[in-house]
Regions:
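Surface-exposed, short loops/turns at beta-strand junctions within beta-sandwich domains
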Residues: 78-85, 270-272
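Single conserved hydrophobic/aromatic residue that forms the stacking wall/gate
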Residues: 1-8, 12-13
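Surface beta-strand/loop "capping" patches
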Residues: 15-53, 111-117
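Compositionally biased, intrinsically disordered or flexible polar/acidic segments
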Residues: 108-298
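Short, exposed coil/turn segments at beta-strand boundaries within extracellular/luminal domains
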Residues: 94-104, 286
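Short beta-strand segments within Ig-like beta-sandwich modules, predominantly Fibronectin type-III
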Residues: 64-73
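Short, aromatic- and glycine-rich surface loops/edge beta-strands on solvent-exposed regions
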Residues: 85-94, 276-281
């Protein structure tokens, strides 16, 4: 019997007929990818290939990346994705016959200096999220380094359960069908900085207040983790962008309600090579940020 079953976001191949060829590139439904790139030209990310062959040759855009030995019917291959369309081919040979599987995706290499167009960042997250409607990819946060982009200060928001912590909140966020953008956050963030070139940028800030006085039923995909209720926090903070105040006393829960998506857009000119800095100041409790999107207008 040969079968395929879905586990999380990957395909696990179950094979009991060893003589039948099995070959499958994982995550083929992920059509829009992105990642931080030091040169703006390529970004290396792992890609799993499932097969019952002893080895598999992997190609990127027609060029061989090498032949990889297979262990326990799976091999993880580091793919140097390039900007634009990427075609990945996996090839095995069984009894003199060649078998091939193919994966095609669009990739955005995020680099603030070379060809920067946009960056979409999930704060408090170490996961990716594909927005298929908008055809874009949200990438994990990183700490700021000179010449790049990232957060300054704060810590990942805890998502506590009776059995430990979840990597993200399980809350159903009101006002959006893109819950993963709002289910993680950085608490106590001081700033988000991007050393982008001079120009005009649209800056989108994404918030939701994940603490609430209301007990909500766990979502189906919570799988009975018994989330520990976090009490409501009266959170007030200020926001300024490149020295210009855009909010003096922002209270997300008071103004919009808890567990509700809030998106604010600002048009920001960048000049004199100073880059882009969004600063957060505590008024009561500590600031939060769930996600940020920076798009170059011109």
């Amino acid at each position: 019997e040969i079968g395929v079953r879905l586990v999380g976001s990957e395909m696990c191949i179950r094979d009991s007929l060893k003589e039948a060829p099995v070959l499958h590139i994982a995550s083929k439904s992920w059509k829009n990818r992105a990642g931080a790139s030091r040169d703006g030209k390529s970004c290396t990310q792992p890609l799993k290939v499932y097969t019952n062959a002893d080895k598999v040759e992997v190609f990127l855009n027609g060029k061989s990346l090498g032949v990889y030995p297979v262990s326990d019917k799976v091999v993880s291959v580091d793919i140097p994705f390039v900007n634009g369309e990427n075609v990945v081919d996996a090839v095995i040979e069984k009894e003199g016959r060649e078998y091939r599987d193919q994966y095609v995706c669009n990739f955005q290499c995020v680099n603030v200096k070379n060809g920067f167009t946009e960056v979409n960042v999930l704060l408090g997250a170490q996961r990716y999220f594909e927005d298929r409607t908008a055809e874009l990819c949200w990438i994990p946060e990183q700490a700021y380094e000179k010449g790049s982009w990232g957060y300054i200060g704060g810590e990942v928001a805890p998502n506590k359960t009776r059995y430990g912590s979840l990597p993200a909140s399980d809350k159903d966020i009101l006002g959006t069908d893109q819950d993963p953008i709002f289910q993680t956050q950085r608490v106590g963030i001081e700033a988000f900085k991007a050393d982008v070139p001079d120009g005009v940028y649209a800056v989108y800030l994404y918030w939701t207040e994940l603490t609430s006085e209301n007990k909500r039923e766990a979502l189906v995909y919570n799988l009975g983790n018994d989330v520990v209720r976090e009490d409501y926090i009266n959170r007030v903070f200020s926001v300024d962008i490149n020295g210009v105040s855009v909010a003096k006393q922002l209270n997300i829960a008071e103004e919009y309600g808890s567990e509700r998506a809030v998106i604010k857009k600002y048009i920001v000119p960048v000049s004199q090579g100073k880059g882009l800095v969004v600063r957060f100041g505590a008024v009561e409790s500590v600031p939060i940020l769930n996600a940020i999107r920076i798009v170059k207008e011109y």
